[in-house]
């Protein structure tokens, strides 16, 4: 295997590790109940999903955050189907919006953003957003850890903060180690290197399909969530397919070949996350048992999930009309 191929697979593994961190740690349910085999299995699934997402990002030349939202919806739907269908689709169709598109979709988008930022911080606006986004994630994580065991212990049993942070650090450590090891090889990597040849791409799709069979056989995954997820993935794929443009620069062009971010940025991101987490964890309950900071988080996930596709559709439709008007075709 060539050095470039090793780098490409390193990037896929790195993004897979970030997706695992987002889906199992930031969306904290009961990760201490997972065995080593469970963690390895979910890490393998997340790496396959990361491989698919990076291929589609390069194949269809995604250009902006709205293309990224269509892309990460596919990732969120696959995570919901393959890693924890009992949690993701516990109350279908409500949890399809709140937990899959809302929670998994948003954290997946953030993990993609973190990966790109660590590859190269090229924009001052991006620099200004890094630490606030990290702090927001820490605040949300602290609220979830503190109050979810109180109001929904069946979702997230109580775990001492110190143990939760140790596990979070243990899962994030491979992400940081992979980034550190890839810092120099990333300087020679180009976006189109992330595309798979046709046969490996088809094998990847076949592997993802095969991984859904055990859940279908055991009944953990029912036909309703499966059909709905496949339809939504088809919508996302169509958006990416019809949005592709061989002429316009793609999002990955701004980050690859990489000029890796200084290590102090990663320390700052971790520091902002931890500080906000500790602050939120020690806040008293604001409001009542029905309306409080945890309730606001859950409503926020629901709103994100409900608006995910309509927002993408509205923005892309507006841009298409605007482009046609500029060409005097309307």
PLM features: residue spans?
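Generic multipass alpha-helical transmembrane bundles of integral membrane proteins
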Residues: 114, 128-238
């Amino acid at each position: 295997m060539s050095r470039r191929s090793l780098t490409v697979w390193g990037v896929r593994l790195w993004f897979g590790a970030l997706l695992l961190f987002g889906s199992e740690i930031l969306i904290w349910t009961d990760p201490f109940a997972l065995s080593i085999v469970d963690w390895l299995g979910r890490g393998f699934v997340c790496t396959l999903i990361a491989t698919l997402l990076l291929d589609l990002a390069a194949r269809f030349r995604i250009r902006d955050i709205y293309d990224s939202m269509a892309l990460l919806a596919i990732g969120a739907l696959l995570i919901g189907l393959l890693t924890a269908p009992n949690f993701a689709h516990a109350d279908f169709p409500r949890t399809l919006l709140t937990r899959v598109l809302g929670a998994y979709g948003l954290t997946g988008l953030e993990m993609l953003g973190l990966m790109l930022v660590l590859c190269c911080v090229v924009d001052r606006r991006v620099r200004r957003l890094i630490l606030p986004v990290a702090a927001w994630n820490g605040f949300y994580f602290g609220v979830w850890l503190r109050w979810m065991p109180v109001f929904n212990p069946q979702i997230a049993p109580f775990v001492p903060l110190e143990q939760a942070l140790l596990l979070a650090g243990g899962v994030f450590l491979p992400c940081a180690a992979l980034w550190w090891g890839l810092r120099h090889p990333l300087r020679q990597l180009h976006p189109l290197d992330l595309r798979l040849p046709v046969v490996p791409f088809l094998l990847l799709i076949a592997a993802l399909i095969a991984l859904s069979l055990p859940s279908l056989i055991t009944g953990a995954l029912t036909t309703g969530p499966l059909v709905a997820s496949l339809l939504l993935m088809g919508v996302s794929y169509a958006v990416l397919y019809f949005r592709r443009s061989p002429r316009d620069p793609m999002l990955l062009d701004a980050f690859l070949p990489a000029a890796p971010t200084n290590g102090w940025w990663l320390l700052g991101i971790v520091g902002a996350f931890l500080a906000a987490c500790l602050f939120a964890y020690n806040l008293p309950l604001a409001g009542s048992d029905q309306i409080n900071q945890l309730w606001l988080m859950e409503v926020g996930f629901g709103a994100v999930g409900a608006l995910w596709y309509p927002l993408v559709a509205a923005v892309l439709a507006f841009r298409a009309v605007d482009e046609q008007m500029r060409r005097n075709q309307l």
